[in-house]
Curated annotation (Swiss-Prot):
HAMAP family: EF_Tu_A
Gene name per UniProt: tuf
Region feature G3, mapped onto this chain: 91-94
Gene3D superfamilies, A to Z: P-loop containing nucleotide triphosphate hydrolases (3.40.50.300), Translation factors (2.40.30.10)
Protein source organism: Methanoculleus marisnigri (strain ATCC 35101 / DSM 1498 / JR1)
Name of the protein described by the UniProt record: Elongation factor 1-alpha
Stated role: GTP hydrolase that promotes the GTP-dependent binding of aminoacyl-tRNA to the A-site of ribosomes during protein biosynthesis.
């Protein structure tokens, strides 16, 4: 078995009906990910219906039918390989939990492919998704200007849309010069896997080339070690075994650690991954570890493990930048929904609405607004109702994002800008 290629999480973003699903379908199709037996069954069906020419469209329609019948395409379909990487397509926006997943790290994207339909250009969700990507720290972006077939492969139209997008990207803080813009048609297949003869004026990479050219995500090993606890087991003959994923830094055997906000200390006796003992664990590793000096009742899910000399930060209150994604009426001071941050779920109160921002530029629109509604971006002050670990997004981004949930849906998403720490010792 060859060594596993490096893995990348790819978010496919863009306005509704601009061709996100078709683009994903085309990438799966072109990389040989749609299983041959599925293609074969469509080919037969196409022939039986007298449609001799088997087209990619059939694959897409069938995937769409599966969705409509309520069968979600399992995740195996959503993985594809390029020469350099293997990609997982993380939930696309439109899924209710997309933002929650993106923020709480269930599927932190390493890069995003923004799909913009050439006939329409920049639309409302295009702006929203670009702003969100920036807020969430997605630094690598590829832009597919899609449906070029519908725009008659017109170079002038492509340049107009590219210019609109460049303005938008600059506004939120991306550098358009570092980004690939690709004229494409996911439906026809132009410039996805191979250069299209329909765009002789375009000299740049195909979408697959651009995906291959992304830089490998760096493991945040230089940051202080942080491991949010998912579960705690008590194993006879061994003792207390917390389980979780290392988010940052390196966990080593013999390390003195603190669990916050439990405020308990211990020493790591052993670390296990996939039932094998390992001397150290790196970011992304899911591990169980045994700690000397900690009882099962001392710590729980939502606590965070870190080195005793740089323990996880417990917030008395914190200042956050939030985007209100879906609130039935208006959000005011005193509102206390549940914040999902790493593995913790804690009710937190909005104690001050400091500034309302323009969600497309991040510029201040209004000081001390009286309320926030769906679509607003703002700087707010938050006070957790119980002790909670959160870090500044600039310092430890993996623990600086959160989603706000209430009544079964994601109300808002945000990042932590500043913290008033709670004195724990």
């Amino acid at each position: 078995m060859a060594a596993e290629k490096p893995h990348m999480n790819l978010a496919v973003i863009g306005h509704i009906d601009h061709g996100k699903s078709t683009t994903v379908g085309r990438l799966l199709f072109e990389t040989g990910t749609v299983p041959p037996h599925i293609i074969e069954s469509f080919r037969k069906e196409a022939e039986s219906k007298g449609k001799g020419s088997f087209e990619f469209a059939w694959v897409m329609d069938s995937l769409k039918e599966e969705r409509e019948r309520g069968i979600t395409i399992d995740i195996a379909h959503k993985r594809f390989d390029t020469d350099k990487y293997y990609f997982t397509v993380v939930d696309c926006p439109g899924h209710r939990d997309f933002v929650k997943n993106m923020i709480t790290g269930a599927s932190q994207a390493d890069a995003a492919l923004l799909v913009v339909a050439a006939p329409d250009g920049v639309m409302e969700q295009t702006k929203e998704h670009v702003f969100l990507s920036r807020t969430l720290g997605i630094n690598q972006l590829i832009i597919g200007i899609n449906k070029m077939d519908a725009a008659k492969y017109d170079e002038k139209r492509y340049n107009e849309v590219k210019e609109q997008l460049s303005q938008l990207l600059k506004m939120v803080g991306y550098k358009p010069d570092d980004i690939s813009f690709i004229p494409m048609s996911a439906f026809v297949g132009d410039n996805i896997a191979k250069k299209s003869e329909n765009t002789p004026w375009y000299k740049g990479p195909t979408v697959l080339d651009a995906l291959n050219a992304l830089s490998e995500p760096e493991k945040p090993t230089n940051l202080p070690m942080r491991l949010p606890i998912q579960d705690v087991y008590s194993i006879s003959g061994i003792g207390t075994v917390p389980v979780g994923r290392v988010e940052t830094g390196i966990m080593k055997k013999g390390m003195k650690v603190s669990f916050m906000p439990a405020n308990k200390e211990g020493e790591i006796k052993s670390i296990e991954m996939h039932h094998e003992e390992i001397p150290q664990a790196l970011p992304g590793d899911n591990v169980g570890f045994n700690v000397r000096g900690i009882g099962k009742g001392d710590i729980r899910r939502g606590d965070v493990c870190g080195p005793s000399d740089v323990p996880p930060t417990v917030a008395e209150e914190f200042i956050a930048q939030v985007v209100v994604l879906h609130h039935p009426s208006a959000l005011t001071v005193g509102y206390t929904p549940v914040f999902h941050c790493h593995t913790a779920q804690i009710a937190c109160s909005f104690v001050e609405l400091m500034k309302k921002l323009d969600p497309r530029t991040g510029q201040v629109k209004e000081e001390n607004p009286t309320f926030l509604k769906t679509g607003d971006a703002a700087i707010v002050k938050i006070r957790p109702t119980q002790p909670m670990v959160i870090e500044k997004v600039k310092e430890i981004p993996q623990l600086g994002r959160f989603a706000v949930r209430d009544m079964g849906s994601t109300i808002a998403a945000g990042v932590c800008m500043d913290i008033t720490p709670k004195q724990m010792r």
